[in-house]
Regions:
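Short, acidic, small-residue-rich periplasmic hinge/interaction motif at the N-terminus
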Residues: 31-34, 41-46, 71-81, 89-133, ...
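Periplasmic N-terminal accessory/gating domains of Gram-negative outer-membrane beta-barrel systems
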Residues: 80, 93, 116-170, 176-211, ...
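Face-selective signature of the C-terminal outer-membrane beta-barrel domain
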Residues: 293-309, 337-509, 593-596, 644
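Surface-exposed extracellular loop regions of Gram-negative outer-membrane beta-barrel proteins
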Residues: 317, 525-574, 596-616, 690-704, ...
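Membrane-embedded beta-barrel scaffold of Gram-negative outer-membrane proteins
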Residues: 364-368, 378, 566-620, 625, ...
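Outer membrane beta-barrel strand-and-loop segments of large Gram-negative receptors
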Residues: 402, 406, 410-414, 568, ...
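Gram-negative outer-membrane beta-barrel transporters
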Residues: 490-493, 597-600, 617-700
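C-terminal beta-signal and adjacent terminal beta-strands/loops
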Residues: 692-700, 725-793
C-alpha cells in the first residue's frame, strides 16, 4: 500500500512539474505616448479566454500555455490596439508596449475616442488651456469652472467653489506636494496669478468629491497637477495686454530642468471697474522643476516657487446706478486715500524616490517648505451721496483703515510608498507638518451720516467697527494613510475597488480624526460603453488659520481676535453615485456623465462671504447638508474639436442659531458651456467660447448673520470668446529662417464679457441716520479686448 502511495505521489509531482514547465509568464507595463501608465488596459491571449487588466501603475501579469507561437493583444478604449508575437517563449517574458491615442479619420478631421472613468478623478486636456479666453490670465482653474459642480463668481480670480463648498475647502497638489494660496486675499484685484504655471503642466486630474485617503483633510475637491519632464531643449513664450510668460526646459540622459517666469499687469482690465482711479497692480512668479535620475531606480526631484504680488490703488471717484427701470438709484463717492497690498510667497520641495521593481513598488521621502508674508494696508476717506429719482436718501462721509500683517511658515516631511501585488496596488504614507503663524491686525471704520457719527450716541464720536488681532501660534499636525486599489475581472465585468483610511492629529486642540474612504467602479461585460461608480466616506475640514479666529467683544466695544482652542474639524459624510455612458451620434463620439451626491455636515463653522473674503465665526455652532445632481455632455459638437455642456442642480442649508437658512454657497443651478470650433475654409483659424449662467449667492450686511436677514445676489452671467490663428504649425512650418525653429505660433484675439453684463461681486452697505441700510452693488469687470501671442519651440 505504501508503495502504491509513493508511486501516486511521484506521478502527481511529475504532472505538476510538466504543467509548470509548459506555461509561460508574461509581465510588463503598458504606457501611453508620453510614457505614462495606462490603467484598465486589456491584455489577452488571442484565440483564448486568457486575459487580465493593468493596475493603476499600468502593470500586468498573466500566465499562458506554452506554444510555438503566442499572440498577445494590448488594447484600451481611446487607444490603438497593439499585438505582439512571441516565438517559442520560455520562462518569464517581459513586454512593455506603448499605446497611442486612437483617432478616426473623417476627411481632414480626426475624431478621438474617450477613455472610461472608474474613479472620481477625471482628467483634463492640458492643450486646450493655451487657447482658452481667460480674464484671470490663462489659469488651469479657468477650465475647471466650466466643469459640472464647479463655479466661480469672479473672473479676476482663480478661486472656485465645488458642490456647495467654500474656497477654503479645495486642496491643490503639484507633483504630490500640497500647495497653498495667500490667506488675506479679499478681491480678485489683489490675487494676481494662480500658483500653477500652465506652461509647465503635463497632467491635470480633478475630483469633485469622493477622493481617496491619499489626499489631505479637505471636504470638497482635489486638484492634482503633475509637471512635465522635458525630453530635449524646449520652450514656450506668450505675451498679451495682461502680461507675459516664458518657459525653458532642457534634458540630458540623467537630468532634466524646467524654468518658468510669468508677469501680469492687468490695469486695463481693472479700468473697467466702477471705482475709478490709478490702478498699479504688478504680479511676478518664478518656478523651477529639476529632476535627477542617476540610475533607473533612483529619482531626485526639486520644485521651487517665488511669487510677489503688489497691488496699489489710489481711488478718485465712483458712480453706480442700480435698481429696476422704475426704481433707479444712484450712488456717488469721491475718494481720498490709497491702498497698498503686498503678498510674497516662497515654496520649495525636494523628493527622493527609489523604485524597487517594475511592479509598482517604490518609496518616496519628501520635504517641503512654504512661507508667506502678506501685508494689507489702506486708508481711504470718502464722501457719498445716495439718490433715488432725484430724492436724497443718504449723504455722509466715511473713513476705512486697515493694517494687517500675516507671516506664516509651513514645514512638511512625508514618507510615502506603493506596493504592487498582483492586481492590488497598496499605497501608504506618514507625514508631519509644522505651522508657525504671526498675525497682527488693526481695522476700524468710521461713518458720518447727515452730520452724525454712526452708531449715533449723543455726546460721543464712535466708530462703526473696530477689530484688533495680535496672535502667535506654533502647532504640529501628524497624519497617516493606508489604502488599497484592487482591480479584477469577473464574468459580470471589470471592477475597481479603492478602500483606505486616513488618520490625523493636531496638537493645538488635541483632536484625532479617522477618515475612512471607499470607491467602487464597475464596467459591465455586456455593455462596455457604460461605467458605474459609487464613492463615499467621512471627510474632515481641518481648521487652518482663518477658521479658528474668534471675535470677542471687550467693554469698549472693540472686537478682539482670539484663537479658539476648543475648535473642531468640520465633518462631511458623503455619498456619491455616478455613471458614464459613451456613444456615437452623427458619427462622432460623445460621453454623458451624471453624478448624484449627498453630504451630511456637522461641526460647521459658520461664515459669510464678502467678494473673495470668508469671515468665520470661529466656533462650531452649525450643522447642515448638501444635495445635488451634476451632468455633463462631452463630445465632438463640431467634428474634430472637443466641447462640453455642464448642468448642476444643488441645494445646501444649515441650522444657524436655531434658524434654517441657505448656506453662503447655496447656488441652486449652474449651466456652463465650453465650445470650440474652426472655420472649414480656414482650418488654421480656431474659435473658442466659455459661457456661464449660475444662481446668485445669499449674502447679508456686515456684522450680521443670515439668521438675521439675507438677500440673494443676481445670477452670474458671462460669455468670453476667443479667436486663434495658427501662424506656424506642424503642417506649415518654414524650412529655414527664424520661424523654422518654432513648433507652433498662435495669434489670438479675446473678447471678455462679450454681452457686457454687470455682474455683482459683493455689496457696499450704506446706512442713514435712521439706521436703514441700502445694499449698493459692487460690479465686476465689463467688456474688454485682449490680444495675445503664444509660441512653442
Amino acid at each position: 500500500m505504501k508503495f502504491h502511495f509513493r508511486i501516486l505521489t511521484l506521478l502527481t509531482c511529475l504532472l505538476c512539474a510538466t504543467v509548470a514547465f509548459s506555461q509561460v509568464k508574461i509581465t510588463g507595463k503598458v504606457v501611453d505616448a508620453a510614457g505614462e501608465p495606462i490603467e484598465f488596459a486589456t491584455v489577452r491571449l488571442l484565440g483564448t479566454a486568457v486575459g487580465t487588466n493593468t493596475d493603476t501603475k499600468g502593470l500586468y501579469e498573466m500566465t499562458v500555455p506554452k506554444a510555438d507561437t503566442v499572440m498577445v493583444e494590448f488594447s484600451c478604449l481611446g487607444y490603438s490596439t497593439v499585438t505582439r508575437q512571441l516565438i517559442k517563449p520560455e520562462g518569464t517574458v517581459t513586454i512593455n508596449p506603448k499605446l497611442y491615442e486612437k483617432t478616426l479619420e473623417l476627411g481632414e478631421v480626426e475624431i478621438t475616442e474617450y477613455k472610461k472613468q472608474t474613479t472620481t478623478m477625471q482628467g483634463i486636456d492640458v492643450d486646450m488651456l493655451r487657447r482658452t479666453p481667460d480674464a484671470s490670465g490663462g489659469s488651469v482653474e479657468a477650465v475647471l469652472t466650466t466643469m459640472a459642480g464647479v463655479s466661480s463668481k469672479n473672473e479676476m480670480s482663480s478661486q472656485y467653489m465645488v458642490r456647495g463648498g467654500s474656497y477654503d475647502e479645495n486642496s491643490v497638489y503639484i507633483n504630490g506636494i500640497e500647495v497653498y494660496r495667500p490667506q488675506l486675499i479679499s478681491s480678485g484685484q489683489q490675487e494676481g496669478m494662480s500658483i500653477i504655471n500652465p506652461d509647465m503642466v503635463r497632467k491635470v486630474e480633478f475630483s469633485t468629491g469622493g477622493f481617496s485617503a491619499a489626499y489631505g483633510d479637505r471636504m470638497s475637491s482635489v486638484l492634482d497637477i503633475t509637471y512635465r519632464e522635458p525630453e530635449a531643449f524646449e520652450g514656450a513664450l506668450a505675451a498679451s495686454l495682461q502680461g507675459g510668460s516664458l518657459m525653458l526646459g532642457h534634458s540630458t540622459r540623467h537630468y532634466s530642468q524646467m524654468h518658468g517666469i510669468r508677469y501680469k499687469r492687468n490695469s486695463s482690465l481693472m479700468g473697467s471697474l466702477e471705482s475709478k482711479g490709478e490702478y498699479d497692480p504688478q504680479y511676478f512668479d518664478y518656478q523651477t522643476s529639476l529632476v535627477f535620475k542617476p540610475t533607473d531606480k533612483l529619482r531626485i526631484a526639486l520644485l521651487g516657487n517665488v511669487s510677489i504680488n503688489d497691488y496699489r490703488f489710489t481711488p478718485v471717484n465712483r458712480e453706480t446706478s442700480f435698481g429696476t427701470s422704475e426704481d433707479v438709484k444712484s450712488f456717488t463717492v469721491y475718494f481720498d486715500g490709497y491702498e497698498k497690498d503686498k503678498f510674497q510667497t516662497y515654496f520649495g520641495a525636494g523628493a527622493v524616490t527609489y523604485k524597487f521593481n517594475d511592479k509598482g513598488t517604490d518609496l518616496t521621502l519628501q520635504a517641503s517648505g512654504y512661507r508667506t508674508d502678506e501685508l494689507v494696508a489702506y486708508d481711504i476717506h470718502g464722501e457719498y451721496w445716495l439718490d433715488q429719482a432725484g430724492q436724497e436718501l443718504g449723504v455722509g462721509k466715511y473713513h476705512e483703515h486697515e493694517r494687517t500683517r500675516l507671516k506664516m511658515n509651513v514645514l512638511d516631511l512625508t514618507l510615502r510608498g506603493n506596493v504592487g501585488i498582483n492586481n492590488n496596488s497598496i499605497s501608504y504614507g506618514l507625514s508631519m507638518r509644522k505651522e508657525d503663524i504671526y498675525d497682527r491686525s488693526r481695522q476700524w471704520q468710521w461713518r458720518d451720516s447727515a452730520g452724525y457719527s454712526l452708531p449715533h450716541i449723543p455726546d460721543q464720536v464712535n466708530v462703526i467697527f473696530t477689530e484688533i488681532s495680535s496672535n502667535d501660534l506654533n502647532t504640529t499636525r501628524i497624519a497617516g494613510w493606508l489604502m488599497d486599489t484592487w482591480r479584477f475581472t469577473s464574468s459580470a465585468g471589470f471592477w475597481s475597488l479603492n478602500a483606505g483610511v486616513r488618520l490625523s492629529h493636531w496638537n493645538f486642540n488635541g483632536e484625532t480624526l479617522i477618515s475612512p474612504r471607499v470607491s467602487l467602479g464597475f464596467v459591465p461585460e455586456r455593455n462596455g460603453n457604460l461605467s458605474l461608480r459609487l464613492a463615499g466616506g467621512v471627510y474632515y475640514q481641518a481648521p487652518f488659520y482663518k477658521e479658528y479666529r474668534q471675535q470677542v467683544m471687550d467693554t469698549l466695544g472693540n472686537r478682539n481676535i482670539l484663537l479658539n482652542k476648543d475648535i473642531k474639524s468640520q465633518r462631511s459624510i458623503q455619498v456619491i453615485l455616478g455613471s458614464d455612458y459613451t456613444f456615437r451620434a452623427l458619427d462622432r463620439p460623445f460621453k454623458l456623465t451624471a453624478e448624484a451626491y449627498y453630504k451630511n455636515l456637522s461641526n460647521l463653522i459658520p461664515y459669510e462671504i464678502d467678494n473673495l473674503k470668508l469671515v468665520y465665526s470661529g466656533v462650531n455652532s452649525s450643522k447642515g447638508y448638501i444635495a445635488g445632481v451634476d451632468m455633463k455632455l462631452f463630445g465632438q459638437f463640431v467634428e474634430g474639436t472637443d466641447s462640453w455642456l455642464s448642468l448642476s442642480l444643488m441645494k445646501t442649508q444649515e441650522d444657524l442659531n436655531g434658524v434654517k437658512v441657505p448656506r453662503p454657497t447655496d447656488q441652486r443651478y449652474s449651466i456652463a458651456l465650453f465650445f470650440t470650433d474652426y472655420f472649414p475654409n480656414i482650418p488654421r483659424l480656431k474659435f473658442s467660447l466659455k459661457g456661464v449662467i449660475s444662481d446668485g449667492l445669499p449674502t447679508t450686511a456686515p456684522h450680521l448673520t443670515r439668521a438675521d436677514s439675507y438677500v440673494r445676489q443676481p445670477a452670474y452671467k458671462r460669455v468670453d470668446v476667443g479667436l486663434s490663428y495658427e501662424l506656424v504649425g506642424k503642417e506649415h512650418r518654414p524650412t529655414s529662417g527664424l520661424f523654422s525653429h518654432f513648433k507652433e505660433i498662435w495669434l489670438g484675439l479675446d473678447v471678455f464679457n462679450l454681452m457686457d453684463i454687470s455682474n455683482v461681486s459683493s455689496y457696499y452697505w450704506v446706512t442713514d441716520v435712521n439706521d436703514i441700510q441700502y445694499a449698493v452693488p459692487n460690479y465686476l469687470t465689463r467688456r474688454q479686448l485682449n490680444v495675445r501671442l503664444s509660441a512653442s519651440f
